[in-house]
């Protein structure tokens, strides 16, 4: 896997997707740009090149695999396998891995078609490419982000050079003693052992370990500075580079003009067992030809450039029966909580049959007929009688007995909010949500133990998670939160935020005991409860009106008389409790001591990691900062947040 190295500019792809939906970009264009935007960009005239086309191809860089593993051919195969499967599942609702090693067991998909896709992407190489910032990109916080990242980099460099200078002084002494000319570390690395000093000359085993850590930190923070540069994780067409460096992948100044190796069907999916050669191609079962050759109607161009563009146009062809059905099925699922066709990533024989096949066909036809436009599709669905059904029905029990899965859509099924919707809903209710669109990733406050726990990456430990300093920065939509595969937000993970390593066709909404504990006890929930209490206190003077307003904000309705009296009584009762019990004051560390074992000697060593974000951190209001009355009102707000009425869409 990718060792959790940060892909610093991936925020630009996220913003490209948001811009595309907001502009109501036609879906066929959206598909083509993500698969072959760089090929479109190449033919644009100088001075009129659209950065969005390069940014769009970050879709091909979203997978978990690191292309610079020790076993480079295997790493390359893993990357291509992930891209092929992602394209198949996302745009065609077809699980491509099912016919990688042999012909598909249940669908008319031969292995040759899989390797036709493989050949299509065989010329695709990874690179961070220059792409000027576009007018619509939000660059707020660029200078502040650069400054804080450089502060961490400067600290790492200082510690690194202190150890390196000590090592090189000892190396000079070694050369002087032998009457030889001093050579710097990089220049002497390839020499035989007898012609150079020991590798870590002059350093103790503990210092050796620290030197390795600081060298890695130097690279990590240098890499993170790229987040603020006009770069984009993209691709280009060319032969496989002789050497791959995951730390700095740049497009060559001149791409070598050499023939690409032929792609073969791999018997059993093994690189060591090549079979018949294969040309770039598409899925023959669709019956949509791509060439005028009657013997090979489903092959694509064999030129190094244009393969992906030809594939993208085939996918986005109005006559392709899968593409439009795949996306309208997902849109329907987003509105109703479940799709028309039961497996959004798999329309094959092993997927569930559509409950309303004619409706799916009609929606797909209508979607294409009206320009592949999403906003019209959303409006069409949301104005339908089926969508506007109530969750209440006079014969609900009879319906549940006769149609337990509600396939006939006789009533609206309640849906629990997703992990991101819960957090965003809390911020909307408290009035704290920052509705800015786009920009650099923000870091919400997460559980402190998780934020500071050691997290292994290749050769070292990853830097600790430091939240954004200001509440306005932290309180943006969860869409804009910094996300790293090896350190998920425990709150979001607990409420079934999907694993980012694989395409998620359907959210799980299981209810488990830890969710209840988290909703009552987590810092996120208690901080939002205090924020809501402070909001209603600011808006109204009397407790009775404050209670009414809290219910109105949380539920979108006013409490009935019985609820009102009970809730008011509860607040008065809790105020007495808080007068007698004072809350603890949380502490934020400004540095942390890490412990590791030096791999060459097996000896333990420690080093310091600074946490400058907490030196000027502006935390959310905590219990110790408000009076007993506010804490009691916050307890009421916490109760409201824990109800089904808040957690579910009815």
Which stretches of residues belong to each language-model region?
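Primarily short, surface-exposed interaction patches in extracytoplasmic proteins
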Residues: 1-46, 79, 108, 159, ...
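Residues that flank catalytic or metal-binding motifs in active/ligand-binding sites
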Residues: 13, 55, 113, 117, ...
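Sequence context surrounding c-type heme c attachment/ligation sites in exported
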Residues: 48-154, 158, 492, 504
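Electron-transfer interface patches adjacent to heme c in soluble/periplasmic c-type cytochromes
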Residues: 68-80, 123-177, 295, 314-315, ...
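Acidic, aromatic-lined catalytic clefts of primarily extracellular/periplasmic carbohydrate-active enzymes
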Residues: 465-468, 479-480, 513
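Globin-like tetrapyrrole-binding proteins
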Residues: 636
